[in-house]
Amino acid sequence: MSENTKQSPGTSCSVDQQRPVFYVIAILLPFVLLLILEGLLRISGFGKEYPLFVPSNYSQDYLQPNPEVVKRFFHQAKFAPPVGPDTFLFRKNKDPDSIRIVLMGGSTAAGFPYGRFGSPAGMLNQRIKAQFPDSHVEIISVAMASINSYALLDFVDEVIEIEPDAVLIYAGHNEYLGVMGVGSVYASNGSHAANLLFLKLKDWRIFQLIQSIYYALFQTPVDVDHSDGSRTVMASVAKEKAIAFDSALFTEGSAQFEQNLMAIQSALSIAKVPLYLSTIASNEMDLPPFSSSSNPDVEQLIDRAKPRSNRRIIQQGVTLLERGDTSADLAYAVAQAMLDESDERAADFFTLAKDYDLLRFRAPSSFN
C-alpha cells in the first residue's frame, strides 16, 4: 500500500516566496549574457569606435576633431567617403575666461570650395576676436561634406562634453543626399525610427558582430567610386536623382530634418548651451536647375532653338505653373524673363525653380 506524502504549509510558503526571485533571474539572465559577450568582444579588440574628438598629435593637452569620424556610420570603413572635419586644436580642459563656439554642418559650413578660412568658422573667428580682443576665442568646426542632420544629432552629446558657450548650426543642403539621407547611396533601408536606433546601437560590439555576419552571408555593401577627382563627394553619393517636390521622399527628408533639429535643440537646452540656427543660402539666380521634369508645352515654350519673347514666356509660363506644373526649367526660364523685364517677382520664381529641382543638392526654401 502506497503512502501519500503531504507538503507542509511551511515548505509551500517558502517555494512561493522564491518564485519572484526565479522570475527576476530568468528575465535578467539573457541581458547578463549579452553584457558578458559585449565585454569579451571589446577585450578581444573586435570592432571599433570613432569618437568625435581625439587627442592632438602635437600635445596631449589639446583635442581636435577626428578626421576619420565619418567612418562611424559605415560597417566597413573603406566604404566611407573620403571626408573629415578640418583640424581645429583646442584645450582639453577649457580655460574659464575663454569663448568656445562649435560650428556644426555640412560642406558649406566646412567652407567648400574655399577652405577653412573662407568658412563660417574662419569668418566668425575674426569677428569675435575683433569684438572681444582680450578674450581667448576658440571656434571649433565639426562640419564636413556629405553629412546631414543625422550626423549632427549623433555628434551633439560629444559636443556638449567639451563645454561650448554656444553652438552654431548651418545645415540643410545635404539633407536628402548626405549620409543616411533618403536620396543617398548610403541611405538606410529603414524608417526614421530605424535610423535613430542604428545611431544608438552602432558602437555596440554585438551589433557590429551581427552586421559582419549579415553582410558576409546576405549582402555586399554599396561600393562607391571616389577616385574621380572631377566629381564632388556629393555627386558621387547621389542615388535618387529625381526627388519630386512634395513627393513621399521629399516629405520624408523634410520631416527627418525637422525632427532631428528638434532633438538637437532639446539636448542642448537640457545642457543649457545656447543654439544659433542659421538660415541657409544658395545661388538661385546663376545656377540653373540640375534636373527637371518636362512636358511638350514646357519644351515648346522654352525651346532655345525657337526663342520666345520675355512677355510670352512670363504670361504662358506663370499660367502653366499656376495650373500645377512643377518643371524647374520652366520656373527658371520665367524668372530669367522677369529679371530681364525688371519684374520684382523674379526672386520668387528663382526660388521656385530651386524647389522644383529634382536633384536635391540645394535645400528647399521650406527649410528656412
Model-based region annotation:
Residues 1-19:
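N-terminal Lys/Arg-rich, disordered targeting/topogenic segments
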